[in-house]
Amino acid sequence: MTPDDLLEEFRAAGALLEGHFILSSGLHSAVFLQKMAIFSDPVRTERVCAGLAALIRARYGAVDIVVSPAIGGIVPGYETARALGARAIFVERDPGGPFQLRRGFSIPAGARAVMVEDIVTTGLSSRECLAALKAEPGEIVGAACLIDRSGGRADLGAPLVALATLDIPNYPADQLPPELAAIPAVKPGSRAMKAS
């Protein structure tokens, strides 16, 4: 799957939105990628995650385990693991706490794991997920995502491959361009934010 193929999947699903959005990172953007419009369609999800699995194979070789951050990463992580013939596990957190492997999940010695995300903006969830895996005896070979909207600038502390890399501007609330400030903001994301 090419980057253009993936973006066409987002367009066809009505998942490429324009307006004024508050992202889960707290940053503001004129573009929002509504991944759940993709993941609510099992056939489309299978197609895009098979593309991600092919990219993972090409970059990292065989992997045994796909790890994703809950909740948003569970569906693409599971479907990518299925395409790779790997096991799917996830990290989760108590409210306000760090990510951790629970439910008996582990990355045993000798296992090769990749962290799979849906969309990377700042890389915060990915970094937190990878930090939770450092104590595991298995090898974390790298990270992968459907879309890196940071233009390749997000530093995860691990190699990252993306089906598509976009350079979508994001702004702190106090640095909005006038055309964005003129549009009422909506918050379609999933991560809880602290009131400012």
From Swiss-Prot:
Its EC number is 2.4.2.10. Pathway: Pyrimidine metabolism; UMP biosynthesis via de novo pathway; UMP from orotate: step 1/2. Its cofactor is Mg(2+). One of its GO terms (molecular function) is magnesium ion binding. It comes from the Bacteria. InterPro entries: OPRT (IPR023031), Orotate_PRibTrfase_bac (IPR006273), PRibTrfase_dom (IPR000836), PRTase-like (IPR029057). Orotate binds at T121, R149. GO terms for biological process: 'de novo' UMP biosynthetic process; pyrimidine nucleobase biosynthetic process. It catalyses: orotidine 5'-phosphate + diphosphate = orotate + 5-phospho-alpha-D-ribose 1-diphosphate. It holds the Pfam family Pribosyltran. Gene3D superfamilies: 3.40.50.2020. 5-phospho-alpha-D-ribose 1-diphosphate binds at E117, D118, I119, V120, T121, T122, G123, L124, S125. Keywords: Glycosyltransferase, Magnesium, Pyrimidine biosynthesis, Transferase. The keyword Glycosyltransferase applies. SUPFAM superfamilies: PRTase-like. The keyword Disulfide bond does not apply. Catalyzes the transfer of a ribosyl phosphate group from 5-phosphoribose 1-diphosphate to orotate, leading to the formation of orotidine monophosphate (OMP). Belongs to the purine/pyrimidine phosphoribosyltransferase family. PyrE subfamily. Homodimer. This is Orotate phosphoribosyltransferase. It comes from Methylobacterium nodulans (strain LMG 21967 / CNCM I-2342 / ORS 2060). The gene is pyrE.
